[in-house]
Regions:
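Glycine-rich, flexible loop/turn motifs
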Residues: 44-48, 120-124, 147
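C-terminal, non-catalytic macromolecule-binding modules
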Residues: 71, 90-91, 95-137
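Terminal RNA-binding accessory module
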Residues: 112, 123-183
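Ser/Thr-centric signal marking residues that sit
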Residues: 79, 83, 89, 96, ...
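Conserved SAM/AdoMet-binding glycine-rich loop
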Residues: 1-90
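Short, small-residue-rich loop/turn micro-motifs
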Residues: 40-45, 112-117, 175
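Conserved, mostly hydrophobic/aromatic
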Residues: 10, 39, 80, 100, ...
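Hydrophobic alpha-helix feature that most strongly marks membrane-spanning transmembrane helices
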Residues: 4, 27, 31, 69-76, ...
Length: 183
């Protein structure tokens, strides 16, 4: 309260690290803690998550994302997804698509897997052709764009705090919508 105009935004945070204290802080801060969380998903398929050595399962992530959305109405919820990780099957990809459809994401960052020399992932069997990884990425990006469009439309006309960028009259709302400010 000593510096009333300071606002904070939580960057990328694992679903397993989000607790009730953080959600309460977002809920009760009057916009000082942005209603926005970026929860890396990587995949919506348990076999892929295990190969990635992720800490969460599909169901644990799903449960937490729904709890977050229920606890903080109008939260901007984002995620990262990697398509074409070694061993990812079409069924795994469709599990990811279904999870993205179900969860209240407002944006996604979708990347195709790219092998890096010297990494464990580069040595895994069953590489996915880059063409397939690219197609899967395009499908998820199209879904993400539609979800983002619907979320923006649902917020249209609502007043919102905007943090202006250094140059010009562009900024971000607390829930991570890019806006142009008139004036």
């Amino acid at each position: 309260d000593a510096v009333p105009d300071v606002r904070f935004r939580v960057g990328s945070i694992e679903a397993t690290e989000i607790d009730e204290l953080l959600l309460e802080l977002i809920r009760t801060s009057d916009g000082r803690v942005a209603p926005h969380l970026h929860m890396p998903l990587q995949s919506g398929a348990d076999p892929v998550l295990r190969r990635m050595k992720r800490w969460h399962t599909r169901e644990a992530y799903r449960t937490r994302a729904l709890e977050v959305a229920d606890a903080v109405p109008r939260i901007g919820l984002g995620a990262d997804i990697i398509t074409g990780f070694p061993g990812e099957t079409e069924a795994d990809h469709q599990d990811t698509v279904r999870l993205v459809e179900e969860l209240p994401f407002t944006y996604l960052h979708v990347f195709p897997f790219s092998p890096k020399e010297g990494t464990v992932a580069n040595t895994l069997p069953d590489p996915v052709p880059q063409r397939v990884a690219g197609e899967r990425g395009r499908e998820l990006r199209a879904l993400a764009q539609e979800k983002h469009r619907r979320y923006r439309a649902s917020r249209s006309g609502e007043p919102s705090l905007v943090t202006l960028e250094a140059q010009g009259l562009r900024g971000l709302t607390g829930d991570y919508l890019r806006v142009d400010v008139e004036g």
